[in-house]
Amino acid sequence: MGNTAIAKKGSEVESVKEFLAKAKEDFLRKWENPPPSNAGLEDFERKKTLGTGSFGRVMLVKHKATEQYYAMKILDKQKVVKLKQIEHTLNEKRILQAVEFPFLVRLEYSFKDNSNLYMVMEYVPGGEMFSHLRRIGRFSEPHARFYAAQIVLTFEYLHSLDLIYRDLKPENLLIDHQGYIQVTDFGFAKRVKGRTWTLCGTPEYLAPEIILSKGYNKAVDWWALGVLIYEMAAGYPPFFADQPIQIYEKIVSGKVRFPSHFSSDLKDLLRNLLQVDLTKRFGNLKNGVSDIKTHKWFATTDWIAIYQRKVEAPFIPKFRGSGDTSNFDDYEEEEIRVSITEKCGKEFCEF
């Protein structure tokens, strides 16, 4: 590296520091003073279910006044309470309304009624990375690297705000109209300064320290990044089995096998991310994220250009118009029922 290149690297590191410092001020201001509810169910025309979960669903809706399309997440308060997800749900809304980053889905409105909580987010018509990955089989390394770079930058941003994401998987990554990623579902995200102990996440993506009920930190996100990059480039995750317990045994064993088509740089990066020993895992060492950003597999990545969305995406999803749902599966439609009496008012008073 010549002196000018070193100087450029130095100034880039400085400008990232400045950027993150300002981002933290912005975040803390919104985190401490979340704005009041700014809409109601009657403001939206419901179009179609985009996905369902254990305590709610996500629907495509159209804002009647502006005719804009949005994705509305509807959570049944009583089910949230039954499944002991109150804290997670309050976290999700409080975090989403306070963050701002090119690869994070934006929360536009939130409100509640007697029965449900509502989070209205920008609609990302390209659908889940999951469905594209399954259809194509696997992504080429440059294709996988394009997405991985966006996750690296997103985690660098979130971690600088003391946020752990904890739910990285292809189902939670939407592909937007420009072919870039939008991270969605902050249901497990949490603001943590030191360690935390909650068992949550998706079996294939859990870090060993979560499985072993150890206190864990943001390094679990870097482990999950390793799982994601492997799955994007292979077409299947590094640890899989029929039963979660068998998956956990494989994860904790620290043994990973790579497909023969993986480049040696990719294998090297993955060995450092899928590292059971926390004192050796990339992202968790004294250089932090720069061990990942300067790794050989990312040598061709222009981090600033990715952040500015100036790099041409390897794939643009096909869709017709802003309200097209052809990239999402079909689900059985169900009426939204709202009780005449308030449910769980106390539990969700801060929502």
Curated annotation (Swiss-Prot):
The modification Phosphothreonine is found at T198. GO terms for cellular component: cAMP-dependent protein kinase complex; centrosome; ciliary base; cytosol; nucleus; perinuclear region of cytoplasm; plasma membrane. The modification Phosphotyrosine is found at Y69, Y331. GO terms for molecular function: ATP binding; cAMP-dependent protein kinase activity; magnesium ion binding; protein kinase A regulatory subunit binding; protein serine kinase activity; protein serine/threonine kinase activity; ubiquitin protein ligase binding. Residues 44-298 form the Protein kinase domain. Its EC number is 2.7.11.11. PANTHER family: CAMP-DEPENDENT PROTEIN KINASE CATALYTIC SUBUNIT BETA, CYCLIC NUCLEOTIDE-DEPENDENT PROTEIN KINASE. Belongs to the protein kinase superfamily. AGC Ser/Thr protein kinase family. cAMP subfamily. This is cAMP-dependent protein kinase catalytic subunit beta. It comes from Rattus norvegicus (Rat). The gene is Prkacb.
